[in-house]
Amino acid sequence: MSNYSNSSLASYTKLSPNHSGQRTHAIDRITPHCVVGQASVETLGNIFSKTAKQASSNYGIGADGRVGMYVEEKNRSWCSSNNANDQRAVTIECASDASEPYAFRDAVYNKLVELCVDICRRNGKTKLLWLRTKTKSLNYSPASNEMVLTVHRWFARKSCPGSWMYARMGELANQVTAKLSGSAEPKTEQTTYTVKTGDSLWKIAARLLGNGSRYTEIKTLNGLKTNTIRVGQVLKIPAK
């Protein structure tokens, strides 16, 4: 089994009793979550300290960008409604808005990038991958230098990590991998598209992303409140 360590980015520690003891699988996944509230690391620590809550995460990022640790990386947290995932994933609860799309503040997202870089580096990984689909991600066997992103919504009827973060999972993977490789600028596959006559969000997603149902990612990425778009409007398109 791996030699485990914990992140030096954590400035607050309150270890939760809610965990399964040492992992049965080496770390090769990271699972970001949304808290559904602009909570502090102390609030998360208090929540996870209660045995009746039956929940915990390895780390949490408070609304101010501070990092808390609640379950050491060597141990499996109770976070993603799935034993197999949490045995191999470092789980991170992130302060968010209390309603859809559960947006993160800049301080939280930027710290998430930094924390993912640290987790990957300490666990010998040079690439963070977002494979997009549940089937592909859960059936993928990572190379020894690879870490895979997973999400709570694959294991429970939840939005988690929220539409805001879900639309940015590819960006997160690219930014982390770029920092791990020492690149000055993170590689991004995000592009733009100018709306034409007859377009709809569904049609654009089907044509550019290969799946019309991914229109929600375009909607979230552009901060659209409705499905209405206008000819000439420039839309940001997420990575394919």
PLM ranges: what are they?
Residues 1-86:
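N-terminal catalytic cores of peptidoglycan-degrading enzymes
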Residues 186-210, 233:
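Primarily a LysM-type cell-wall glycan-binding module
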Residues 25-29, 54, 87-89, 188-190, ...:
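Extracytoplasmic
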Residues 26, 102-110, 195-199, 209-212:
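Soluble non-cytosolic domains of exported or imported proteins
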Residues 36, 73, 85-100, 117-121, ...:
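Cell-envelope and extracellular/periplasmic
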Residues 2-13, 19-24, 98-189, 231, ...:
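Basic/polar, cationic surfaces and motifs that engage anionic cell-wall
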